[in-house]
Regions:
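Beta-rich interaction/scaffold domains
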Residues: 1-157
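A cross-kingdom C-terminal cell-surface attachment/processing module
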Residues: 165-178
Length: 178
């Protein structure tokens, strides 16, 4: 009877080891092999989220059944997945901020601070994160920047259309006794 109990325990352990192996090699995890923060695309978000859940589940449910090397490997995969998801998050946040900006046609001088803030966000992105913004984003920022510069120049020139020194006009006004 003791031998049968040991056989049952051994079978249960083997089943647990097989389940741990299956969890570590789940399709969700395999689907994101090779994806890093430096090559991730927006379309990878859903598979990465599934892989993150699968990796967290494997580590949580079977952590004690993996060797130190297997656990480290799973943790490294999880870190890679989280970094890739963070890169997507950065790109999505920047795209959302760009989307909030007015078009160049609707730009006002008061939009300069918002544009500068968004340009700072975009400047902080990696090259791959910038690539995820799409082709239109840099063009929108550049067009808006040009329009705001033109508006600033207009605001700084005298309203008469004469761009000569306004101080001379004021001096003439006082001299003429006006």
């Amino acid at each position: 009877a003791a031998l049968e109990a040991l056989k049952g325990t051994a079978r249960a352990l083997l089943d647990r080891i097989a389940a741990a192996k299956d969890a570590a090699e789940a399709d969700e995890i395999k689907a994101v092999d090779g994806i890093t923060k430096d090559n991730v695309k927006l379309r990878d978000k859903e598979p990465l989220e599934k892989a993150e859940k699968a990796l967290e589940g494997a580590l949580r449910d079977f952590g004690g059944n993996y060797t130190e090397g297997e656990s480290r490997s799973l943790e490294e995969k999880l870190e890679t997945v989280k970094a890739a998801l963070a890169a997507i998050g950065n790109a999505e946040k920047a795209a959302e901020e760009i989307g909030k900006l007015p078009s160049a046609d609707d730009a006002k001088l008061s939009d300069k601070s918002a544009l500068d803030r968004v340009k700072e966000i975009v400047a902080g992105l990696t090259e791959n994160e910038k690539a995820m913004l799409g082709k239109d984003a840099p063009g929108k920022l550049d067009a808006l920047d040009e329009k705001i510069k033109a508006l600033a120049e207009e605001a700084n020139s005298p309203g008469t259309g004469d761009t000569s020194n306004p101080a001379l006009w004021i001096a003439l006004l006082f001299i003429s006794g006006g």
